Amino acid sequence: MKNIEEYFNSFYRGAKSPELKTMRYFMKKYNNFDKTMKFIHIAGTNGKGSCTEIISNILIKQGYKVGKFISPHLIKYNERISINKRNISDEEILELINELQPLVEEYKKGEKENVTFFEFITILALIYFYRNKVDFVILETGLGGLYDCT
């Protein structure tokens, strides 16, 4: 792989049918670990970033380990995924990309459907948070609505 940015930019960014098939597929591959996690899901038109940051700060001050998933990023993709204010490293992203890449290809072959960039980075973030045993995951809604992959 050339670099993280090129890999992320290779993902499908168009519209898909509104369903959660991709997320369910990947969560099943990982034994539905998401069912064991505590989520705070931030949605709405304005203020998601501020609200996410405030809640994260409160929980960290109380001694909790907090995973935070936001979008968009300003400079690097790493900004979207953090634990207790520390962004995921390039090495950690590459390790997860290498692990997930065969599953992405398997999904595309079997389901005859692309995985979107936002689905992929959400899956990557959830696995990262799970493996790092966070107490809470704060997720900013992506597109919003019933079929949002967050």
Predicted feature locations:
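ATP-dependent carboxylate-amine ligase catalytic core
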Residues: L20, M27-K35, K61-T150
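A conserved segment at the C-terminal end of the G1
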Residues: K38-I42, S50-G67
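N-terminal start-of-chain detector that recognizes signal peptides
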Residues: F11-K16, E53-I55, G110-E111, R131-V134
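Positively charged, low-complexity intrinsically disordered leader regions
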Residues: M1-K38
